[in-house]
Structures are given as structure tokens and as C-alpha cells.
Amino acid sequence: MIINKAIDLGKGKILSIETGKMAKQADGAALVRLGDTMVLATVVSSKTPPPANQDYFPLQVEYREKYSAAGKFPGGFFKREGRPSEKEILTARLIDRALRPLFPDGYLFETQIIVTVFSSDQINDADVLGGVAASAAIMVSDIPFHNSMSEVRVGRINGEFIVNPNINELQGSDIDICIGGTANTICMLEGEMKEISEAEMLDAIKFGHEAIRKICALQDEMAAEIARPQRSFAPVKAPAKLKEVIAGLSETRLKELAYTPLCKEDRAEKTASVYKETLQSTLELFKALLTPEEIAAEPEKALCLNAHIIEEEIHAVEKKVMRHMILDDGKRLDGRTLDEIRPISIELGIIPRAHGSALFTRGETQALVTITLGTKKDAQSVDTLTDSADKRFMLHYNFPPFSVGETGRVGGTGRREIGHGNLAERSIKMVSPSETDFPYTIRIVSDILESNGSSSMASVCGGTLALMDGGVPIRKPVSGIAMGLIKEGDAYSVLSDILGNEDHLGDMDFKVAGTEDGITACQMDIKIDGLDYHILETALEQARKGRLHILDKMEVAIPISRGELAQYAPRLTSIQIPVDAIGLIIGKGGETIRSITEETGAEINIEDDGTVTIACSSPEGTNAAVETIKTLISKPEIGNTYLGKVRDIRDELGAFVEFLPKTDGLVHISEISKERVTKVSDHLKVGDRVKVKLVDIRKDPRTGKNRFALSIKAVESEPEKSDENKAGTEGN
């Protein structure tokens, strides 16, 4: 049965969902269309029961964009799609984070969602459509799932909110936020903004939620028409007696630990000891109590001897203890109050050869952040279905295993690292200088050296500080903070600057970055239903206060960006040349521009409009390159001095010197030296670089072309210049 339903999102944007035509052997499939952008999502969930010791939900979300969707060929030798791009990885995470909380607890069957873009009109981005398609595919399947979920993008143009703005509309929008949620609650946020207020942020979320409700209703209608019953599964539950025994053995000790402020390492060690001893005591107790006959008669009693189940129940006790300590007493694991920020320390300029650096430490989370400045040639070429551009601002985030005291794989960038780096990049990008004001390519690298929560927000703070240390003229400093939530019934507590345990055992991870004037980026993941807007408003206001506190600490370390670039950073100088002179600067096969680079140490980039950008770490090299270029495009003028190259020698006549591109002049034998010269080759050789002065220009009566008379002797007679090595025109 083919079902197709559509909804008008406003401004003539029709979103349609179709199922029953494609990929019918998958457990569920849905095709979503907006404009000419079409996304197919499929879902398959294994019916093979998971292993008894499995304690996680193996959900895999893949998002892939076909180049054929936009009528393009893939690059590279093989001409086919390769590994996922950064855009594809980020979109897969966007979908995963919104869907994962909606699967029922205890559902641990291997599940794979594949979202494929088969058509792109290069105007409507497919990312949020992929989230809708994935949810619709699950809803028409028999896979257990709580509620339909939808994702939308919200923009704001001239104060008016808009759902799913297209690529052109986003250019004029001051908000770009992706929202995922059910009809009842928001479960995922991610986006960037141009310093908007907390109230404006809340309004954008509410506006997006209205569209989400409509799209969810569309999915619910489809599911009702298909009326496919959900498959049954039996989550493993510990017997009541086992829970009682474990609580008796561990709760008091875990409570003592929770109320004792400890560093991460000590807490982990002592908690592991409680787990080990409780496990051992529980196994000994039930081995003595249960006989093989009892277990055979009531197989569920065997769970009392399952180490994995026992550890899960100890974890449940630990979670309960921490949550009640926060809700009932307003205390946290490290002794802080609910809105207290951990101690902050900042060191600047600690990496001598970097173009800017900062070591930002907040509690037991530490980021070493460096910046590198480059030219336009260093920009990253990005080719997606909707855009092809050069990216001149980037932030790369690295999370090595030693940062959490573990061993692990080194090399390659994981999805989590790409996601955290992207969030930090979007947070700072909003205050980065324009290309006109600062024509550098900027690369920020954040290496996490220690981690106990909020490492991505430490990267935001450290990245801002490194830019300021490097003299990059950012508009305003940016700081970031991670907020948490503990909610039981109507009682809740919002936590500022959460620890790793508070993230793991809590209900929300809400990262907010911004300046003193507003929010520049956010990311939120919710693990529970029923997050109302009052809680969200509280979290945003508490985040604002925390953000300002951190900004104050950063301002003490460095109030404004340094007045000059770092010693080893390249200096960029731009000059304009006539378009028809570009070929002269480049030379045959790039010979001339390579020669300038070799002689001056400067990197030279020429735009089609004649803009020449010169990058060099030394002022002398920059000046030499500028003067050489000016010389190359200048017209011969009597009295000017040039640095030329000997092209030919006539012993009894003189030397022919190329003093401008493709322009030779004669240095007569009498003009080579103040002393008498009998043989030119005794003084000059072909290829020599010599300074010459243009002393005369005469027309050849036969050809009508100019003949140039040059003198080395005239240069030697002049007073010595302060910069003898400077190439190019002197005396202009």
C-alpha cells in the first residue's frame, strides 16, 4: 500500500512523506521531499536477541549524499562516493541524537538507519529532511518506538521566523538552528546565531516546535493507516530480591562517596571498589541461597547470579544517590552549589612557535589550543551538494585517550571529535574578522589534555584566548558552558558547568556559547520526555550568568587582542596590479613568480581581479617582494634604478641586461665601471644580477622601437642606500 501525505510549511514550502513504494524489504522506509530535494530513509532492526552481557543499544545511523543527486561527478580517480564527508557525519549525528532517546529502555537489538539523498535541488538542505524520513521509516515499521519525531531548521530574516529556510534565505538570517522533537517535547537542538538573547532563542524554539507538531501529526496519520503492530520484546529486569540486596550492600557506601568531594581519579577508584565488593558479596549470598533445582524451576532467578545484571543494579543505585543528593540537598559530587563554576586558570603564549596559544583549565578539564595563520591557498576546499566554497576559518578538536586516563586507538578522527569541533567552530566563527579586515586563513586546534566534562566548551574558551594571544582582531570574546538537569516528577535542578558523571547520570546536556551580548551557538540533548519551556528558560538564564563569569576570568588574562601578530606568523600585504600585468608576474610556466618566492621567501597569491597578496614572516622579505612586483609592472623611466639580469655579453661593446620583464637595455662598456674596462667578460657573466640606472631612451630610426641605455657606473656613483638588498625601483 502506497501512502503519500503532504503539509504546507508556509511560504509555499510543501513537505511530503511517502511510504510503500521503495525499499519494501526493509523493516520500514520513507521518502521525504521538499522542492526537488528527495531523501530516502530505511530502517532494519535485527530479530536476533542481543548477548546476555550487552548493556548498550547498538543503533547505527548513516547519512549519505549521492553526487548524482545534484548531477555531479565524484572527485578522485575512482569516480564514486568514498568515506563519509564531515557534512555527512555531522548530519548522521544530528539524526542519531534526536532518535536515540525515543527507543524504549531495554531495547538492545542491533538497529541500522540509512538515510540517502537521491535528489538535491541545491537550494533546500537535506539534513533535517533526513531526520523526518528516519522517524517516518520507524513509525511505519514494527520496531518499538515511543513517539514520532521531526526535525526542522529555523531561521529569522528581518525579525520574522521562517521554517526550513533555503540556502539563499540563510544568507540573510541571523539564526540557523536545527530543532528535533516530538509533539510534546524538544529533545535536540543545534545551531549558530548572531548574538541573540535568551528570550529570542526561546521564541525560535517555540516557533520551530509548532512546525514539528504538524509534521509529527502527518507521521502519526501514516502509522495509523498502516496499523502495523510493534514487535514484542522482553527487557531483562532484575528480580526485586536482587535489587533489595544490592541496595542494602551498596547504598550507604555510595552515599558516603557522593557527599565526599573527591577528584575524578580518586572517586573512580573508590567507586570501583564498591562495585567489586558489592558484586562479590551478592554472588556469594545468592550462590548460598539458590539451588540448581530452584533455578531450573524459576529461570529468572538465575539473573541473581549474572554479574552484568548485578553491576547494572549497582549503577542504578549510584544514579539514584547522586540525583537525590542534588534534588534534596542542592549538593554536587565535587561540593559545588548548583550554579557554581569550577576554578579556572589561563596561560597564554606557552607554545613559542605557534601563531597564538592558550592553556585553558576549568576544574579537571584542560584544553591546549593553538592557532595557525595562513594565506588563501591554505583554505579548505569544501564541495557539498548545495555549495562549493573555500573555508578560511576552521577548528579541529582532538580527544586522545590519555585525557581520561585510558589507552585506546590513536589516529583518525572520530564522529564525536568532528561533532565537538564543529560546535566550537560555530561558536567562535560568529566573532571572527571578515576577510576584508583580516585576509588570513585561520586554523584553530584544540587538544584536550584532561577531561571531566565540558571539553568542547573549554575549546571555545581556549580558542578565543588563542586568537587574542595571536593578535587576531575578533569582534568580541566568546565563552562556553555546559548545563545539566536532574528531574524527578515536578522537582528539578539545573546544573552549571557539569562534570562527566553529572552528564552521564543526568537528564540533559545543554551547551551554550556566546559573548557578553548574546548567544552564538548551542547544542542540547535531552534523555527524558516532558522538558517544559520554564526549565529551558531557567537553563538559558543560568547559562548566561555562567558565561559572563567565565568571560570575566578571560578578560583578566587578556582584555583585548594583542596589537600585533606573533613573531612567526606571516604578514600579509596586498597590492593592486593591472589585470593585463598578471601574466608578467607569473611568467612563463610560473618562472617569474617562483623566482620572486625563492629570492624573498614570500608566498604570493594573485586573484583574477589583479589583487596580489604577499605573505612573509619577515618585513624585509615582504618589502623585497612588493618592490620586485612594482618593478615588473612599471614602465621604464629615465633616472630610475633597476635590479636586472645579464642576458648577453659583447666583450668590445657591453652587456645586454633585462631590467624589466621582456625589456632589455645596453650597458655600454664605458658604463660598466669608473675604471677602464677592456673586456666585458672580465667584469660580468651571463646570469649575473646587477643594479642599473636607465640613463637614456632613444627610438631606433629603422624599427621605431625604443632603445634603452643603462649604466652600472651611475649607480655606483650614487650615495649608498639604507637597504642595498631591496629589489625594484629606487627613487620613484
Swiss-Prot record:
Family: Belongs to the polyribonucleotide nucleotidyltransferase family.
TM spans (from-to): none
Catalytic activity entry: RNA(n+1) + phosphate = RNA(n) + a ribonucleoside 5'-diphosphate
InterPro entries membership: ExoRNase_PH_dom1 (IPR001247), ExoRNase_PH_dom2 (IPR015847), ExoRNase_PH_dom2_sf (IPR036345), KH_dom (IPR004087), KH_dom_type_1 (IPR004088), KH_dom_type_1_sf (IPR036612), NA-bd_OB-fold (IPR012340), PNPase (IPR012162)
A single Gene Ontology CC term: cytosol
SMART domains: KH (SM00322), S1 (SM00316)
Gene3D superfamilies reported in the protein's UniProt record: GHMP Kinase, N-terminal domain, K Homology domain, type 1, Nucleic acid-binding proteins
Residue ranges, compositional bias (Basic and acidic residues): 715-732
RNA-binding found in the keyword field: yes
Keywords assigned: Cytoplasm, Magnesium, Metal-binding, Nucleotidyltransferase, RNA-binding, Transferase
Residues annotated for Mg(2+) binding in this entry: D503, D509
Domain of life (superkingdom): Bacteria
Segments forming domain KH: 570-629
GO biological process: mRNA catabolic process; RNA processing
Function comment: Involved in mRNA degradation. Catalyzes the phosphorolysis of single-stranded polyribonucleotides processively in the 3'- to 5'-direction.
PANTHER family in UniProt: POLYRIBONUCLEOTIDE NUCLEOTIDYLTRANSFERASE, POLYRIBONUCLEOTIDE NUCLEOTIDYLTRANSFERASE 1, MITOCHONDRIAL
Cofactor or coenzyme needed: Mg(2+)
Protein name as annotated: Polyribonucleotide nucleotidyltransferase
Entry keyword Zinc: no
One Gene Ontology term of the molecular function aspect: 3'-5'-RNA exonuclease activity
Gene (UniProt): pnp
Domain (S1 motif) ranges: 639-713
Localization per Swiss-Prot or TrEMBL: Cytoplasm
